């Protein structure tokens, strides 16, 4: 046997969406109900485990044989579930695939697993089996009754008089439904195999599978949580919200001061008309509101802070050994191949600005509500700032947090050949000061000569690198930072004039992509290759990885200009036709290349215990003797395919995760 395509149906009393597959399989009642498989492309078989059937010995052997490639759609689910099931059946025990000091858990080695969901994402398609089937027009899509059957057999049911008070539906409770469920299981394997056939001409490069396997190892390893801090933070938030609600009721006499509608009406009755009670809007109102209304708005701000949701997610996801696993979705952003967050959502953790973070953390950890309230006043904000600190290294270890310095700006300058910017990076200069200096033709130093211009340099750098104009400056908060409306267009013009190679790069990329779609003409710009093939626009990066745009064609944008359109997941999370153009493609290319550089660093440091990666940052669980400087030097090495690109990684050591 060379390959095994698999789909399983499982039961657990835990909510998979809320806790993730690692915790899901730790439920005492977890079990595999159906095991659908095809060995070496033969007709699909289904093993009805729930009814007492057994998986053939040669298939069991293949699951633990690293010479057999296992395929599944979202293979992580099958791999982790089967790891638990095989352990329960005495087939697979104490078979750690890493060294004893690692915490990858007793899971099947991911190196012999491949995932058609990842292949689909690599091809620019959705991350759901139904979505991929619909886009590819596969005849054997998931049966529409599938979701209802999963809910019926795979999740606990409410006890009722009609069902005899049972809390779980078994095959004998609905034989017809069970027969349909088995057909559905077979269909899933067939669809998964059809996807492989459809994509056979466009294999995923081996380096991407290696990245996937490293990603799975990091997800298996997980990261330790300080559960004492988590529990105390949740308890403190509950008390804080109760106190704030009482205070609000006293001031407003409202039945429910948390109600947006009631609060808007109360403010209106007190002379303050509001359209929204969003964070920005409340901050603006606080500048001009009378003192009595300011007090109410400040309390409203504190009540609206969702500081506890991340802690609750941690509580739901933490495994029996105190670690959270499965937090990173490989290829979650399929335009660039970047990761997406799962469960705790590491990519959008609140920042920390408290100067005495460790002291605040200590007070919360020991449940000193009065101390926190006395020293920090805003309890929800304090709890929010402490969320990162719930992630801790295992006993006897430290965290080394290292990230790339201005990686996107460096990659953009390298691609475009913007020499002055590359020189700034090479000399370790401040790009915001240097940008302001280029735009306004005067020296600019942070906290020094013309230091006030640095802010303009910063906002321009953040907003204008990918074709942004006045609207992008506003969206980035230029007006709130003190710039006036009539300063914005001159700032755009000044930035573009001082970065002419970048502007040229935008439109060279635009032209190459347009030629590929319009004339099927292959092209190359700065080492980036374009071609149209089998109804796909492919952009090949210097790393060798391809970006895929599905069913590209020409359209007309809102300005009446010819543009490229393609199919993808839009802002509404639905599959739709999207527009793109040169600067937007440059953003995809730069972010994708930055992602590839991070992957190169992860491979370089794969001998370390990487526990987390957030944007361009790695968090490593290191023994006390590991040298920070050496680790940062290794992370900052330039990949062989990026000759001339100047990288730098900076880091710090800490006993709990934080933003330094």
Regions found by a protein language model. Give the residues of each.
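A short acidic-Thr-Gly-centered motif at the start of a beta-strand
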Residues: 1-2, 60-64, 383-398, 603-605
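Conserved "right-hand" nucleotidyltransferase catalytic core of DNA-directed polymerases
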Residues: 1-16, 27, 34-36, 124, ...
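Conserved catalytic palm subdomain of right-hand nucleotidyl-transferase polymerases, strongest
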Residues: 5-6, 73, 114-115, 391-407
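Short active-site loop/helix that positions an aromatic residue
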Residues: 76-91, 123, 264-269, 405-419, ...
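A common structural junction motif
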Residues: 481, 635-643
């Amino acid at each position: 046997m060379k390959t095994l395509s698999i789909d399983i149906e499982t039961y657990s009393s835990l909510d998979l969406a809320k806790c993730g597959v690692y915790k899901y399989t730790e439920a005492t009642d977890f079990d595999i109900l159906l095991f659908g498989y095809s060995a070496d492309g033969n007709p699909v078989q289904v093993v009805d485990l729930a009814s007492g059937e057994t998986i053939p010995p040669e298939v069991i052997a293949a699951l633990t044989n690293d010479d057999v490639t296992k395929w599944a759609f979202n293979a992580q689910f099958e791999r982790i579930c089967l790891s638990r099931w095989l352990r329960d059946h005495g087939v697979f025990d104490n078979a750690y695939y890493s060294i004893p000091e690692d915490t990858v858990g007793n899971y099947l080695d991911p190196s012999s697993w491949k995932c058609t969901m990842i292949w689909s994402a690599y091809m620019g398609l959705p991350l759901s089996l139904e979505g991929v089937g619909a886009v590819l027009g596969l005849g054997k899509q998931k049966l529409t009754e599938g979701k209802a059957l999963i809910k019926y057999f795979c999740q606990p049911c409410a006890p009722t008089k009609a069902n005899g008070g049972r809390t779980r539906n078994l095959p004998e409770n609905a034989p017809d439904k069970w027969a349909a469920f088995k057909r559905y299981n077979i269909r899933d394997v067939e669809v998964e195999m059809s996807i492989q056939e459809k994509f056979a001409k466009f294999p995923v490069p081996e380096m991407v599978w290696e990245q996937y396997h490293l990603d799975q190892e990091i997800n298996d390893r997980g990261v330790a949580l300080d559960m004492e801090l988590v529990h105390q933070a949740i308890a403190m938030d509950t008390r804080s919200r109760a106190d704030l609600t009482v205070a609000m009721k006293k001031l407003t006499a409202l039945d429910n001061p948390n109600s947006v509608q009631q609060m808007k009406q109360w403010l209106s009755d007190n002379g303050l008309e509001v359209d929204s009670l969003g964070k920005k809007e409340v901050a603006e109102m606080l500048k001009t509101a009378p003192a009595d209304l300011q007090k109410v708005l400040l309390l409203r701000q504190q009540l609206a802070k969702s500081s506890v949701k991340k802690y609750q997610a941690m509580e739901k996801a933490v495994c029996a050994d105190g670690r959270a696993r499965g937090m990173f979705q490989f290829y979650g952003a399929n335009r660039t191949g970047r990761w997406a967050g799962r469960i705790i959502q590491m990519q959008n953790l609140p920042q920390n600005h408290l100067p005495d973070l460790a002291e605040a953390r200590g007070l919360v950890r020991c449940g000193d509500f009065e101390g926190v309230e006395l020293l920090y006043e805003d309890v929800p904000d304090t709890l929010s700032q402490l969320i990162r600190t719930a992630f801790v290294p295992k006993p006897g270890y430290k965290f080394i947090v290292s990230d790339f310095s201005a990686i996107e700006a460096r990659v953009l300058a390298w691609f475009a050949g913007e020499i002055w910017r590359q020189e700034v990076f090479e000399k370790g200069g401040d790009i915001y000061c240097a940008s302001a200096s280029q735009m306004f033709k005067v020296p600019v130093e942070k906290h020094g000569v013309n230091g006030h211009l640095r802010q303009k340099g910063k906002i321009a750098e953040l907003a204008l690198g990918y074709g942004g104009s006045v609207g992008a400056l506003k969206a980035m908060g230029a007006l709130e930072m003190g710039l006036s409306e009539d300063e914005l267009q001159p700032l755009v013009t000044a930035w573009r004039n001082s970065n002419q190679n970048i502007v040229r790069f935008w439109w060279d990329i635009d032209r190459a992509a347009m030629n590929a779609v319009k004339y099927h003409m292959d092209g190359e710009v700065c080492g980036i290759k374009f071609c149209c093939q089998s109804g796909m626009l492919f952009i090949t990066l210097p790393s060798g990885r391809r970006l895929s745009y599905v069913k590209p064609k020409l359209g007309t944008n809102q300005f009446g200009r010819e543009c490229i359109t393609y199919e993808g997941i839009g802002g509404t999370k639905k599959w739709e036709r999207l527009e793109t153009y040169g600067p937007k493609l440059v953003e995809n290319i730069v972010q994708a290349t930055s992602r590839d550089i991070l992957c190169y660093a992860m491979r370089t440091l794969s001998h370390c215990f990487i526990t987390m990666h957030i944007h361009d940052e790695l968090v490593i669980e290191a023994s006390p003797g590991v040298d920070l400087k050496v680790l940062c030097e290794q992370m900052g090495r330039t990949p062989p395919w990026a000759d001339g690109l100047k990288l730098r990684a900076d880091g710090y050591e800490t006993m709990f995760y934080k933003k330094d």
